């Protein structure tokens, strides 16, 4: 699965009868949805971008100077005059120079002098700013079912589906082939203040240098370089890259301050680099909050017969995925298709299956299958696939796992924010409370009661509530009632 290869992975586990779950998707992360009676699905935010954003200013990094002219007058003869002084695209400077008999003046004193030079910009020496439009930013979300096929990190799963969302998008339904349909309704949010963000792009001159950065609008507007708007042929403040020398009689030198690319690159050290792909300008941060409908998903292979247990061999022995799960792959030499008999037992409990399958109902197909992912309790375990067995020690602790999943649930609810609550009606408010409980405690509940059936969990919740009603100690009574209520809510709830 896609999520197996990513470091930032989250699990959202639906309880019995779950039809909808709420996810928080962020760039670089991946969420695996598991629910009883449903295929597991990976969902991730693949990209945030805008096509062809609008240009704002262009800055010149290296001036191109030409047609230098100088005019001078003797003392008392009035100001020097050049017609170019009032032409657009020309940089001029007025000053006073020492005049006398040695340079063709009858009087000694200060005379007027003016120098002008035509200023343009060297080719491939521009820095251009682009602005985002929140209404045109596209969020690409991808969905992939767990089919039991191993897919390398650099390969694309044949069942992968892609959809896009904008601020005006509505619900999308994706067809996952034999696994049914999944619906997505996503609310988008960029991780940056778009009104204050500029993409600064340099003309491409060297392959080893980055070409674009995500900068603040105020910093961009304060750059001390010549600038112009798109389509304007003349540069404003061109004098910023021109220096005039000290005047001598009828002469004034003009100097080009040279290429400012290195100065700009030094100023951009540590600034987030922007990614540009063709005409797509990507954002580096942001998230979407998606409500995923699971009601039309269906498990594949439930009618298959069980595989012959003696005809399995390891293709990839059990390995730690890095996400508190175990992954493995087997090959099968018997008749296909069929269901893979897989289970795991803990030390001292040989009759209790402790494996929580992330790949539900693993199968061998005519053209693939055999990849299995599962979660095991901390400690010594033995994994069985048919007659194959493998001893496995799962690191960590049950308490630590509960705290970790609860922390992730709180983070998820915090990101969802105000969208998690419906104050429009009493029913909506209580539904929001149920959803919040599922979001925060769903993972912890599954860690504790993952191997317990629906009826035992229901009876446990009822028993705790009954103890709470019949206990005279107020503290004990409230504790039992709260615990019983949570167990019943997590057992009977249909949304996470």
Swiss-Prot record:
Glycans are attached at residue 154. GO terms for cellular component: host cell endoplasmic reticulum membrane; membrane; viral envelope; virion membrane. Disulfide bonds join 3-30, 60-116, 60-121, 74-105, 92-116, 92-121, 186-290, 307-338. GO terms for biological process: clathrin-dependent endocytosis of virus by host cell; fusion of virus membrane with host endosome membrane; symbiont-mediated suppression of host innate immune response; virion attachment to host cell. One of its GO terms (molecular function) is protein dimerization activity. It holds the Pfam family Flavi_E_stem. CDD domains: Flavi_E_C (cd12149). The chain crosses the membrane at residues 448-468, 480-496. InterPro entries: Flav_gly_cen_dom_subdom1, Flavi_E_Ig-like, Flavi_E_Stem/Anchor_dom, Flavi_E_Stem/Anchor_dom_sf, Flavi_Glycoprot_E_cen/dimer, Flavivir/Alphavir_Ig-like_sf, Glycoprot_cen/dimer_sf, Glycoprot_E_dimer_dom. Residues 98-111 are annotated as: Fusion peptide. Keywords: Clathrin-mediated endocytosis of virus by host, Cleavage on pair of basic residues, Disulfide bond, Fusion of virus membrane with host endosomal membrane, Fusion of virus membrane with host membrane, Glycoprotein, Host endoplasmic reticulum, Host membrane, Host-virus interaction, Inhibition of host innate immune response by virus, Membrane, Suppressor of RNA silencing, Transmembrane, Transmembrane helix, Viral attachment to host cell, Viral envelope protein, Viral immunoevasion, Viral penetration into host cytoplasm, Virion, Virus endocytosis by host, Virus entry into host cell, Zinc. NCBIfam families: flavi_E_stem. This is Genome polyprotein.
